[in-house]
């Protein structure tokens, strides 16, 4: 890590790495595991009553616009954040007015809508390695979200908080985080008093499920840790965060294109800096804040996840990236080049092996990239269906068979449909005109044009009786 730092007192930074020398036993993450195995949404947004089994590692939510992808993610976030009922330093997401399902009805030819209650979010899952069920509900427009059916989860979280607050505690705190579509641009204004109020492991939960992002806490942590490393020497969990960023950047830009990737915070820039040698042997250095949207979107998210793990569980040292938890990401492909979309899920699960990911996407590259993903297909009527793995399938096949989108522009699809219709009617002269139009647009050797030409020639052949 860079020695390019200014001096200041180290007290705050020291307190953030208490417990550094603790040696955790192997397999700690199994005892600390957190995940949702089954999510049920009743009258939640456009879901009347949907039961959604989830994979412990990777869940990909797909569907057309308006089918409920973001709604499902909000339901999952409502469920996962229930853990914060037992944590004094974070608040769970409540069931809100906009979460209530509406149904339309007609009275004397006038269409109206009514709200449908109760709204319920319920789960079966694992918390701190123990099987657990919990539920939250909203019974009416003037009611508050109930928590009675989540008492077991609240008790587990409260006990974890008490144990984690003890000196030299080995208790592992799970990470819960949400990254919405505004994660790059919708910056939340951080409060000045927040740093004074939170000086503990639980700072890792600050704004972790906020719909608007803030990098203030992230930059403060990097600044403090860089200063501490320059004074005290290497800190294992800080090195782990650094490695996470270096690996992701190298994967994004392609290992063959770069060498000697180094990521560090530099006080001179007041930013995280990426330094590497490119394929031409030239040295490059870029502040992360000045990089393209694609790089910043991924690196900011990875940095935020990794540093929160380091704050929550400094006692894990070099194994801090094995922190368990649940991370929810809306439109995982946001700002990413198609080549990066193919790698992002595998990168995330490799760097953070004990996290359960629930992500939404429109991208066929993302859908086909992960071997054992749980694919959840949503339709406009509020249904959620598990479908077979699309791993390794042709992108055009996914567009047609899963996303129900043609792999050509609509105008071209219509021309091919017209050609087939004319061929069926044996109107070969007009079919030939359409074919010639397609040849001009797509080229004589286009595979689909070639097939159409063969079909026309076969239909026009005179067969012996």
Which residues does each PLM region occupy?
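Conserved D-loop-proximal element of ABC-family nucleotide-binding domains
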Residues: 337-338, 342, 369
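Loop/turn-to-beta-strand initiation segments
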Residues: 323-325, 354-357
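Short, small-residue-biased leader/transition segments that mark boundaries at the very start
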Residues: 1-7
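Extended helical coiled-coil dimerization/tether regions that scaffold
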Residues: 17, 23, 27-33, 203-322
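RecA-like P-loop NTPase motor core
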Residues: 346, 350, 365-465
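P-loop NTPase switch/coupling surface
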Residues: 13-217, 233-237, 423, 443-465
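Walker B catalytic acidic pair
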Residues: 330-331
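Conserved H-loop
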Residues: 361-362
């Amino acid at each position: 890590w860079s020695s390019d730092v200014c001096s200041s007192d180290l007290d705050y930074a020291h307190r953030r790495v208490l417990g550094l020398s603790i040696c955790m036993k192997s397999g700690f993450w199994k005892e600390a595991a957190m995940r949702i195995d089954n999510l049920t949404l009743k009258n939640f947004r456009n879901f009347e009553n949907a039961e959604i089994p989830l994979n412990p590692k990777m869940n990909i939510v797909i569907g057309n616009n308006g089918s409920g992808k973001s709604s499902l993610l909000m339901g999952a976030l409502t469920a996962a954040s229930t853990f914060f009922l037992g944590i004094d330093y974070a608040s769970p997401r409540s069931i809100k007015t906009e979460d209530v399902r509406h149904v339309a009805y007609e009275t004397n030819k006038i269409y109206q809508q009514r709200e449908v209650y109760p709204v319920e979010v319920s789960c079966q899952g694992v918390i701190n390695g123990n099987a657990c069920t919990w539920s939250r509900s909203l019974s009416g427009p003037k009611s508050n979200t109930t928590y009675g059916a989540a008492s077991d989860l609240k008790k587990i979280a409260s006990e974890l908080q008490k144990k984690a607050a003890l000196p030299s505690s080995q208790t592992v705190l799970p990470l819960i985080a949400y990254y919405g579509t505004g994660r790059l641009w919708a910056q939340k204004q951080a409060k000045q008093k927040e740093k004074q109020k939170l000086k503990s492991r639980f700072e890792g939960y600050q704004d972790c499920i906020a719909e608007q992002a803030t990098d203030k806490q992230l930059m403060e942590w990097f600044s403090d840790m860089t200063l501490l490393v320059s004074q005290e020497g290497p800190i294992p969990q800080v090195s782990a965060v650094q490695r996470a960023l270096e690996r992701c950047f190298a994967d994004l830009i392609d290992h063959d294109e770069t060498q000697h990737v180094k990521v560090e915070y530099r006080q001179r820039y007041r930013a995280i800096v990426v330094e590497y040698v490119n394929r031409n042997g030239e040295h490059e250095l870029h502040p992360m804040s000045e990089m393209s949207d694609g790089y910043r979107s991924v690196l900011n998210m990875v940095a935020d996840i990794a540093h929160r793990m380091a704050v929550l569980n400094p006692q894990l040292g070099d194994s801090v990236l094995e922190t368990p938890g649940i991370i929810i990401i809306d439109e995982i492909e946001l700002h990413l080049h198609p080549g990066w979309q193919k790698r992002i899920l595998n990168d995330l699960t490799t760097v953070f092996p004990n996290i359960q990911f629930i992500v939404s996407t429109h991208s066929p590259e993302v859908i086909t990239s992960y071997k054992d993903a749980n694919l959840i297909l949503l339709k406009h009527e509020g249904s959620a269906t598990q479908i077979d793995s699309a791993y390794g399938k042709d992108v055009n096949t996914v567009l047609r068979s899963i996303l129900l989108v043609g792999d050509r522009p609509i105008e071209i699809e219509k021309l091919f449909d017209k050609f087939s219709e004319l061929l069926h009617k044996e109107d070969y002269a007009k079919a030939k005109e359409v074919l010639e139009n397609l040849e001009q647009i797509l080229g004589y050797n286009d595979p689909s044009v070639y097939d159409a030409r063969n079909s026309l020639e076969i239909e026009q052949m005179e067969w012996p009786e």
